[in-house]
Amino acid sequence: MFAHPKENIALPVPEFLQMNNLACESVGGKVLFATDDWFAPAEHLLKKTEPEFKVGLFTEFGKWMDGWETRRKRIPGHDWCIIQLGVPGIIHGFEADTRFFTGNYAPRISIQAACLKPEEITLQPREDKIGTAASDEEFKAADKLKSEKWSHLLKMTELKPGYAESSHSYFQVNSKERWTHLRLNIYPDGGIARFKVYGIGQRDWTSCGPNDFEDLLSMVNGGVCLGFSDAHYGHPRNLIGNGRACDMGDGWETARRLDRPPILKADSKGILQVPGFEWAVLKLGHPGLVTHIEIDTNHFKGNSPNSCKIDACALKPTEQEEVKGHGNFEQGYNWKPLLPVTQIHPHKRHFMESTSLALHQVISHVKITIAPDGGVSRIRLWGFPRPLP
């Protein structure tokens, strides 16, 4: 990573970074239109991987860059692109990352949003191709969306160059509306490495009947991580991601606990007797009655936990706001066992049915505890949506 000659300054990290990235390519986010893709295509904005810099790598159009970079504008206007969220939802914040764009970053951006129906989108699929600009036909198709009139979630604001200490810019959003599409404006031109949209997925639960079997914890259905003890190698929000994990980095993995005994001992059921554990608290997308649980340690072959347990509780929205002010995940939550301590194994899908569960009540939150440490790729809570009692 490039270092700026000035002294590094640590910046506070906003709370919304614990939420899901609704625009990531891994959850279906896509670029529908971009005014210009000369040096690097807009699709790079939504990549899940971290940006990289390849010294000495050039294309016929210029320096290869891992992001979206437009040509130096020599005509009136500014550059912009339209992004379709992979998971429609309520947006709580944005992250614009200009890593490695030091003398060619976009100096200013603004962000607009809309909630569109599928039939309103008439844009043709894009080609991921550098050295191009939008054609007249593509501009005409994009103009039909009237995106310049979409709601502003972020007015024009400055970005900073892509040095280590200044590349990440965070913007909080105060909106309770559901959005499906964004217009990212850069002024007037330049590059951004990654663009992330943090929020909570929101589906239409009115179309879901009481007998519909759903993964109540999935990010697509509105599940979200609220807190955790450790996320050294991978964030627990990955537990509720789409599909199975693509690698270890796509799961929740903690550091090795330093309080583990010098010599490990297990009980008759194979559960290690250790003092330490790690935990993550998540909110279901909809309260419900959980009847089946899946714990997937896919890819964690030498670093899965020995055991896992899940506690649950039911909190109404007003109670959620009240306990949020306590600053911890014990006071006011009234946790009850949902899944007793269960031994889990490396690189395996574990399925638990209702006969294995200790709680048969409507719940809204879960606390996942692993011991002593390690990694889990996915957790699914299957059941039926129900109103809170």
Swiss-Prot record:
GO molecular function, one term: allantoicase activity
Pathway involvement of the protein, from the record: Nitrogen metabolism; (S)-allantoin degradation; (S)-ureidoglycolate from allantoate (aminidohydrolase route): step 1/1
SUPFAM superfamilies xref list: Galactose-binding domain-like
Keywords noted in UniProt: Hydrolase, Purine metabolism
Pfam family, any one: Allantoicase
Keyword GTP-binding: no
GO biological process: allantoin catabolic process; purine nucleobase metabolic process
Tissues of expression: Abundantly expressed in kidney and liver, but at much lower level is also present in brain, testis, intestine and lung.
InterPro entries: Allantoicase, Allantoicase_dom, Galactose-bd-like_sf
EC number(s) per entry: 3.5.3.4
Catalytically driven reaction(s): allantoate + H2O = (S)-ureidoglycolate + urea
Described function: Utilization of purines as secondary nitrogen sources, when primary sources are limiting.
Xref: HAMAP family: Allantoicase
Family: Belongs to the allantoicase family.
This protein's name: Allantoicase
Designated gene of the protein: allc
